[in-house]
Amino acid sequence: MENRSLFCYNQLRNPHKKGCAIMKKVLLGCLGTVLVLLALLIGFLAYFGPDYGIFLFPPSPQDYARSVVKKLDFGLYTDKDWENEKKKALEKLESAKTYQDTYPVLEKLTKEAGGKHSYFLSPQDNPENSPESKNQPEVQNQESILYLKVPAFTGDAQAAKAYAKKLSAALKKDDYQAVLVDLRDNTGGNMYPMIAGLSSLLPDEDLFQFVYKNGSKSAISRSDILKQLGLEQTDEKAKKVPIAVLTNGKTGSSGEMTVLAFKGLENVKIFGQPTASYTTGNNYYQLYDGAVLLLTTSSILDRTGKLYKNEAIQPDVLTDQPLEEAESWLKGQMGE
């Protein structure tokens, strides 16, 4: 009885000691749980990560190739023969010693999965390592017709905003009655600054839709374009002026997407030659070694309901003198 009393007395005198012991057990338990979860996460990433381009350690050339092929599964042109084609390709790569050894096979397989608008680019050919495009839009106002030369564009976010703002600033003025958008020789690049700069001419509706091979669709509106560049959203309605768009055989890719943003509008007419026929949507993948995969994953549906799958956009007026005929049409519209 005396010992029990002494024990109780000691417990009453040292409650802090007992609390520390409990806290220590709790902390050790939490630490153990964290370590277990961390181990599971590492195991998960080690096993599944390569399929998504995530590597905890430098991948072998074979694992590198398999991670690229996993992405190619989403290519627009993969069909019933695709599984056999990629199996043969991976067998060829079993003897690869370096990442560079895989490039020729992956380049060929990329074209098979994504068609002519798809590219496997080595680190040396990565667009991010290329000089930025020095092209900037050209603006002229002649006889109340606003001439906008819209060239190809590649560059960072700051350059994209500058490109777009040069076009939008010209369109904010009230000293014109018609607009001529010249997309001849625009071979593409980034469509967002092109369309964003011209956005005040466009209605805030679906400009076009990406259509994936499983049938799902993703619409792009004027607001989506502006949001992508971080530019100010406006509720202003599209300017109702006659618009002529000029095209030729070098109007391609993002240049063609800019044409489609206008095609089908009642105040727009397209003059020139059929475009370059790169009318599909691409996904951009940065690969482990700095190479890049540009993969076509969707066809394009315009506002008229026409589906494009690397088909040329036909002008409304087929002509070898698009500028002269466009000017004549615009002046006629202005006089009405």
List the model feature ranges, each with a label.
Residues L37-F57:
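Membrane-interface motif at the C-terminal end of an N-terminal transmembrane signal
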Residues N135-K161:
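STAS-typified acidic loop motif
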Residues L76-E143:
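Extended, small/polar residue-biased N-terminal targeting/export presequences
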Residues L148-K149, A170-G189, V245-L246:
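Short acidic catalytic loops
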